[in-house]
Amino acid sequence: MNVLLLGNGFDIYHHLPTNYHNFLNVANFLHDHYNEGKEFIGDVFSDKRLQDKDPYIAKCYKEHQKVYDTVILSPAKAKEIIDLCRDNLWFTYFTQSFNKELGWIDFEKEIAFVLEVFNKFLLNVTVIPSMPNGEADACYILKHFGFFMKTTTDGFMGVPTTKIKEKYIIEYPKGSKNLEVNKDLIISTLSSMLDDVAKALKLYLDCFVNITIPRIAKEPYAKKCQAIANIDHTVSFNYTNTYEKMYSSNKIYHLHGDVDRKIIIGVNPDTSDSIETIDTSFVSFKKYYQRTFFETDHEYFKWVNDINETKEDFCLTAMGHSLDITDKDIIIELFDHAREIYVLYHNEEAKKSYIANLIKIFGKQRFDDLRRNKNLTFYSLNMDFTNFADHLRSNSDEVYMMQYGDEKSFAESYWNE
């Protein structure tokens, strides 16, 4: 059996604008220029003002111009993206945090940083705060999200202070005249705003990316990776349906949801999730909570349970996934079950990063064991994959024969179902 692990690099390999910063740039562009008349996706992607801000979109447009210039942009969805992002403080925070020099933004790390600031603040506040502007980053975040305001008078020793807005103050218990910060309202407001960003991202991927993939797949120039031609199960961290529409409709598990359902934007477990110190105040922001609530990993766990029962092993191929420690629970599970492991990389820097990340997850000893016992091997995407594909095909044929035997047995089982 052959299993494929996918990350966003898979979409990038196919020149699709699925990075978070592509979404930010397009959403901001729609806000500023949509009324100029943008009938087709190509009218947006070809605009020099957008391309100057986002050179990768220019690259995608050059690759897929024929398709983009003929796919109609949904006015209703474009307007909804604009409405969801307008005045959304998470969206403006992400936009301001975008590193123009590096050309990327890590939503998860930014969310984790913001939540850490609010968690520290709310854990330590039992009365109405009057906070000196000491920690610049923390103060900026607390004020940016609209819960605080500067006072008109100076605080201690002439230092300006920041106070919470009355909207977020409650009397507790009722009638006691004891005023407290309404922690639940602050957390639910943060969660609601982030949910709107997730909705906007889903709409962007739906009407700018997903809708184009079937058309791109039919084009003779469409780029396809020979190494993943014989896959039985796919575990994807992507929101798009690129693999299904360009390669195979075999069983695929979208752990973070996809454009046809809810999508997950959140952070990983931390010390607040340990049983000794568990704090569920911010649990709705955690990916494991969202995967459970929206049931995006339900089918995946059923499949893993089946593997545990049958003791069936598999060849695992990873493509476009950073193998970062943020997804270590899934990575460890798949790597532990795999008989052989192949990691595809697009350049030497990526290979270095993959090796370093796996060492972080497994440690040196277990990393060496993976190389020694599970044939952990790294392959460049620029190589000839003919022999590699033949190897995977033989694994897939083994599964076929285990399930159905010879062709006659397969035909009988098929018609009897």
Features from the language model and the residues they span:
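Extended, H/D-rich, highly charged conserved domains that either
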Residues: 40-295
